Curated annotation (Swiss-Prot):
UniProt keyword annotations, A-Z: Repeat
GO annotation, cellular component aspect: mitochondrion
A Pfam match: PPR_2
PPR repeat ranges, renumbered to this chain: 239-273, 274-308, 309-343, 344-378, 379-413, 414-448, 449-483, 484-518, 519-553
Protein family (similarity comment): Belongs to the PPR family. P subfamily.
Organism this protein belongs to: Arabidopsis thaliana (Mouse-ear cress)
Protein name: Putative pentatricopeptide repeat-containing protein At1g09680
Keyword match DNA damage: no
Superkingdom as given in the UniProt entry: Eukaryota
Length: 607
């Protein structure tokens, strides 16, 4: 078996030893001399060498040792030059088996003093390719490229130029491009293609195809598109499949304008866009919210006698549902059914999700029943959509029934299912059922996430269960889940409503130390708590603190404070006439009204 390791030593930069003057002149890897054939096929050294190889060669795995132990090979070795090896490859006067010549090349390459040029390796690679030893030929080119490294395409390719008209030269160009590509030297592979055009080689179809495939995985889409246009202009075969792939890549990047250019290029090059071509671009336009272009393409598709398929309708229906254009979505649904197309589960899920989002529960249930009548079975995504729709509508019994039906069908509820139920029951004021669902989650090995914890905390706060809510908050923190602003604010509000503003402020500090920046809503909750306790001085100090850190008070802030000042102006507050203040819009108005309240309070005391 051929091993690159055997030949790798031939590419070293060590100084060669002498076998003969001729071998010394051509013994370096970087030799710029051209390797020419001997003038006479009857060169006695070449004949002796051929006879020695014929008499000593044994089939693998003994091929290498057969030369090492052969006296006739050892005898002719001092007379050999690189020219003789090249002449053996080119002329083969005794018509030796190709494998014996390749085996001898490996042997002689391992001998001190023999360092072949790039051209020599290409000569042998071409010889092997002519005799259909393609794997061995490719391995020689891999050896050349691995030795020369990156940015070597120009210096390596020049060795192929004089071989342009010889048989199998096209194979060598393809193999060289493939080798550079497989080693990740993409610029070198591209340079090989451009040099092949410059020196008028045939288009390296295999090399270009391999390079294009690699670029699809690694390179920016714009670079791939430019290279594809370049090879098409050189004569690379047209393929609408490649255009479709490039369109899809541009669409995924959100670059719809370049995707349109690719689509337009299909017809410019006298190709017919396929249904995949149209669908790719329609879907791209729909994802960026350009429904007009999506429908324009559908019309163009029908005009060109390309029938829209289920995917076409699915993309457009999904876009209509996202824009809450449910009538239009159902119109397309009816159209596709009339054309004999069978809606799939994706389309039904899209419609059901659209109705769920809009709170159209009856239409959601109607679409669900249609789906079942078509023999389609819901997946976990659709079940979760139904559960969410029922929970948002407050129909918790129906939501629970959907989950029970899902379990009977052998589908296990996931985190989204349970979290949606917990949130629904907490919003509905049934925290106990939510806690039971949480236990069910634990039994099934599903951990509660931020949404689930927040729902429980908020639900408990609404019911005034502040101790349980704080316990859930601490559990949330122990699980490594950071509460959001809403959760902290709900906790503060619950404690303040219980008259415990002090704990509310502790939670504020905890919230700030966790990296949160409290909003005006959070401060309003605390201000309301202080005002209800009659701590108006502390409330005004909190207002100043808000202003100092850049939190802008809103109407609720000022009106909460005014209510507090009016209520707690003095113990005889019932005798003070509350000003008709309406909505206070700024700090100056607030201070003016507070001063008015203070004056009224003093006047009352002085009577």
């Amino acid at each position: 078996m051929f091993r690159i390791e055997i030949l790798r030593c031939t590419l070293s930069q060590s100084h060669p030893q002498r076998f003969s003057r001729a071998s010394f002149l051509l013994s370096t890897w970087y030799s710029q001399e051209s390797v020419s054939a001997a003038d006479n096929d009857d060169d006695p050294v070449l004949v002796k060498l051929s006879v020695a190889i014929r008499d000593s060669y044994k089939d693998p795995p003994l091929e290498f040792s057969s030369f090492t132990d052969c006296p006739s090979i050892r005898k002719v070795l001092p007379s050999l030059s690189v020219h003789h090896v090249v002449d053996l490859i080119n002329h083969n006067p005794l018509s030796l088996p190709q494998r014996s010549i390749f085996a001898f090349f490996k042997f002689i390459s391992s001998q001190p003093g023999f360092r072949f040029t790039v051209e020599t390796y290409f000569v042998l690679a071409r010889f092997l390719a002519v005799h259909e030893m393609f794997t061995e030929a490719q391995s020689l080119i891999e050896l050349v490229v691995s030795r020369k490294g990156k940015n070597s395409a120009s210096s390596v390719f020049i060795s192929l130029v004089e071989m342009r008209v010889t048989p199998m030269c096209g194979f060598l160009v393809d193999a060289l491009m493939i080798t550079y590509t497989d080693l990740g030297f993409i610029p070198d592979a591209i340079q090989c293609f451009r040099l092949s055009r410059k020196h008028r080689f045939d288009v390296p179809i295999r090399g270009c195809g391999n390079l294009l495939d690699r670029m699809m995985k690694l390179n920016p889409t714009g670079t791939i598109w430019g290279f594809y246009m370049e090879i098409l202009d050189a004569g690379f075969p047209l393929n609408v499949y490649v255009f479709n792939i490039l369109m899809n890549k541009f669409c995924k990047e959100g670059n719809i304008s370049d995707a349109q250019k690719v689509f337009d290029e299909i017809t410019k090059r006298s190709l017919q866009p396929t249904v995949v071509s149209f669908n790719t671009l329609i879907n791209g336009y729909c994802k960026v919210g350009n429904l007009d272009e999506g429908f324009r393409l559908k019309h163009q598709m029908e005009k060109s006698r390309t029938r829209p398929d289920v995917f076409t309708y699915s993309a457009l229906i999904n876009a209509l549902c996202k824009e809450n254009k449910m009538d239009g979505a159902h119109g397309l649904f009816d159209e596709m059914c009339k054309r004999g197309l069978i809606p799939n589960d994706v389309i039904f899920t899209t419609l059901i999700h659209g109705h769920s989002r809009n709170g159209e529960i009856d239409l959601m249930k109607e679409s669900y029943q249609k789906m079942l009548s078509k023999g389609l079975q819901p997946d976990i995504v659709l079940y979760n959509t139904l559960v969410n729709g029922f929970c948002k509508n407050g129909d918790l019994v129906a939501a629970r029934n959907i989950v029970d039906g899902m379990i009977r069908r052998g589908l296990r509820p996931d985190k989204i299912t349970y979290t949606t139920l917990i949130d629904g029951f907490c919003r509905g004021g049934d925290v106990e059922t939510a806690l039971e669902i949480r236990k069910e989650m634990d039994q099934n090995g599903i951990e509660l996430d931020r949404v689930g914890f927040s729902a429980l905390v908020c639900g408990m706060c609404k019911e005034g269960r502040v101790i349980d809510a704080e316990r859930a908050l601490r559990e949330m923190l122990r699980a490594g889940i950071k509460p959001d602003d809403v959760t902290y604010t709900m906790m503060m509000d619950a404690f303040c409503k219980k008259g415990d503003a002090q704990t509310g402020f502790k939670l504020l500090k905890e919230m700030q130390s966790d990296g949160h920046v409290p909003s005006v809503v959070t401060y309003n909750v605390l201000l309301n708590g202080l005002c209800k306790l009659g701590q108006m001085k502390n409330a005004d100090m909190l207002l100043d603190a808000m202003l100092n850190i850049g939190v802008v008070p809103d109407d609720i802030t000022y009106n909460t404070l005014l209510e507090g000042h009016h209520r707690h102006a003095n113990s005889s507050k019932r005798y003070i006439q509350k000003p008709e203040i309406g909505i206070v819009a700024d700090l100056a108005s607030y201070k003016s009204i507070v001063n008015e309240l203070d004056r009224a309070s003093k006047d009352h005391r002085n009577r």
